[in-house]
Design a protein with these regions (language model features):
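Hydrolase active-site cap/lid region
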Residues: 1-37
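Conserved adenylate-forming
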Residues: 11-14, 46-50
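Flexible loop/turn segments at secondary-structure boundaries
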Residues: 3-10, 64-66, 91-95, 135
């Protein structure tokens, strides 16, 4: 899992400490140089339309590193069969979730891939968005959802 990040919010709106740590790991001390040489290119904008395989996006409803509006924009930019799961009341870490029976989202992603590769569960080109509630029945239950925002609109 990673950030969809079409708007580079991971460095512009998240905690400044996150950017400082990323700069340290990338070997940069100069923030202007880091923005120009690294951060400016860390986006999926302009690339999602080139994806050729079915795609699953999973995001926490209140993820500070990849806000819901960024995930919605990325979802709309995909032109392939697609699905997105929005995990109610969660942020970036998606493990040990009540929404998923105490399991990590990775377990469910593997099930999604198994269904895809076996031909048993194929997403549609139009796409499906599931709102995975804390007390719900998971991403394959009655969870179809239309986000109350469009790309570019703030969720909260």
């Amino acid at each position: 899992m990673a950030c969809f990040n079409p708007n580079n919010t991971i460095f512009t709106q998240s905690s400044p400490r996150f950017k400082q740590m990323f700069m340290y790991m990338a070997g940069y001390e100069d923030e202007v140089r880091f923005d120009r040489e690294v951060a400016s290119g860390m986006t999926v904008r302009g690339y999602l339309g080139k994806v050729k395989c079915p795609t699953l996006l999973v995001t926490g409803e209140f993820d500070p590193l990849c806000p819901l509006e960024d995930a919605v924009e990325a979802f709309h930019d995909l032109k392939v069969p697609k699905e997105m799961w929005v995990i109610e009341n969660q942020s970036h870490p998606l493990w040990g979730l009540a929404n998923l029976g105490g399991l990590d989202c990775h377990d469910y992603v593997m099930d999604w891939l198994k269904g895809l590769f076996s031909g048993q569960r194929l997403p549609t080109k139009r796409g499906r968005i599931a709102y995975v509630r804390e007390q719900g029945d998971g991403p394959w239950g009655k969870s179809d959802w239309t986000p109350p925002i469009r790309p570019g609109q703030a969720y909260f």
